[in-house]
Design a protein with these regions (language model features):
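Conserved metal-binding segment of the jelly-roll/cupin
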Residues: 125-139
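A short hydrophobic beta-strand segment most commonly corresponding to one strand
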Residues: 104-108, 131-133, 148-164
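Short, solvent-exposed loop/turn segments at secondary-structure junctions
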Residues: 88, 138-139, 158-160
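Fe(II)/2-oxoglutarate oxygenase catalytic core
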Residues: 1-102, 112-115, 151, 163-167
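Short, surface-exposed charged micro-motifs
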Residues: 82, 106, 141
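Short beta-strand His + acidic residue motifs that chelate non-heme Fe in jelly-roll/DSBH
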Residues: 92-95, 116-118, 134, 140-146
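Residue-level recognition of conserved beta-strand positions in structured domain cores
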Residues: 85, 96, 119-121, 144, ...
């Protein structure tokens, strides 16, 4: 299930600073990224550069992206954050997330045509400089059918910190 982003003040901060975030992303090397750990969800091409994992700050990675880290740390209840890259012709199979306590936010940074995400019966496309917020405990899948990588800033945060936005 997707949520309207207008009620979430975090999206204003992320969207207005998207070029700063993208600039830090472009300074990273491919070797800085690692395979997404749940390899059963994809055949190839899903890589991540983590900043936070399950509430733990990844200090070395955060030092390479100081401005992005500051923005991420301003989000109440942050649990996970990092750059998520889908290589060309990659498909993440339908799956569900683990916790009803968190919501996910994707900020579009490098978005070629023919990329999308399906959440339940809804399908959306990422847009550069715009956020999508969703509950990943609803079955979802994502794809990049283009010949260029798709990269978003992925953030998971505790739902309880944003109850007023969910009504």
């Amino acid at each position: 299930m997707f949520y309207e982003t207008t009620g979430f003040e975090i999206t204003d901060s992320l969207e207005s600073n998207w070029l700063v975030i993208k600039e830090e992303l472009t300074r990273l090397q491919p070797k800085n990224f690692m395979l997404w750990p749940e390899k059963f969800l994809y055949n190839h091409g899903w890589n991540v550069f983590g900043l936070y994992a399950f509430g733990k700050k990844l200090e070395d990675n955060c030092s390479l992206c100081p401005e992005t880290t500051k923005l991420v740390e301003s989000i109440p209840g942050i649990t996970t954050a990092g750059f998520s890259s889908l290589a060309p012709e990659t498909h993440i199979v339908p799956h569900v997330g683990y916790s009803k306590a968190v919501l996910s936010c994707h900020l579009g940074l490098i978005i070629p045509n023919d990329c999308g995400i399906r959440m339940g019966s809804q399908t959306k496309k990422w847009t550069e400089a715009k956020c999508l917020i969703f509950d990943d405990t609803v079955e979802h899948e994502a794809w990049n059918r283009s010949y260029h990588p798709r990269i978003v800033l992925l953030i998971d945060f505790k739902k309880a910190n944003f109850q007023s936005c969910l009504n």
